[in-house]
Amino acid sequence: MSSIYLDTHIVVWLYCGLTEKFSSLAKSLINSNDLTFSPIVRLELKYLLEIERITASPEAILTTLENNIGLCSCTKNFDQVVYQALTLDWTRDPFDRLITAQSALTDSLLLTKDQKILAHYDYARWS
């Protein structure tokens, strides 16, 4: 089984059980791959909690998904991730840059509904 990276909103939707938000391809990829997240997702979840876009803590979300579906944090060297992110000049969003860069280090698929990522990262998938 290969590994697929999950964008932050995918992690939130999985935690909330919002499977109706997923495309058929997204559901298939989730069910047939190991699921990985960039550690920066943890920080983005904290930001979302602070601005009250979500109500659960990052640890609650990630621990629940780790236990329920085997979601795991990527352990790639952060220096390598940042150097890769420096090449992604199509976005000013640091979270999108780092999440995409983490996936790009190994040309891994990134599951996202983000239109900018889908337009610029060849391995981004949604539908």
Predicted region positions:
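Conserved glycosyltransferase catalytic-site signature
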Residues: T8, F78, D96-R97
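A generic structural signal for short hydrophobic patches within well-formed alpha-helices
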Residues: V11, R42-L45, I117-L118
